[in-house]
């Protein structure tokens, strides 16, 4: 059975180049109701870029 906690796994995808590189992380659904936007390192562009949460 699936857990019923507040933490869910989310996938972060590069803002400019969809489908090229992704990060996987967790977030607390109760504290962060909107979609995540994090600045992470992109090995494709070799610099820090914005990664957005996808469904």
UniProtKB/Swiss-Prot annotation:
Lineage top rank: taxon: Eukaryota
Recorded GO CC terms: chloroplast; ribonucleoprotein complex; ribosome
UniProt entry tagged with the keyword rRNA-binding: no
Locations listed in the record: Plastid, Chloroplast
Main location: plastid
GO biological process: translation
Signal peptide region: none
An example molecular function term from Gene Ontology annotations: structural constituent of ribosome
Disulfide bonds: none
Keyword annotations from UniProtKB, A to Z: Chloroplast, Plastid, Ribonucleoprotein, Ribosomal protein
InterPro entries, alphabetized: Ribosomal_bL33 (IPR001705), Ribosomal_bL33_CS (IPR018264), Ribosomal_bL33_sf (IPR038584), Ribosomal_zn-bd (IPR011332)
Family statement drawn from the similarity comment of this UniProt entry: Belongs to the bacterial ribosomal protein bL33 family.
Name this polypeptide is given: Large ribosomal subunit protein bL33c
Lineage: Eukaryota, Haptista, Haptophyta, Prymnesiophyceae, Isochrysidales
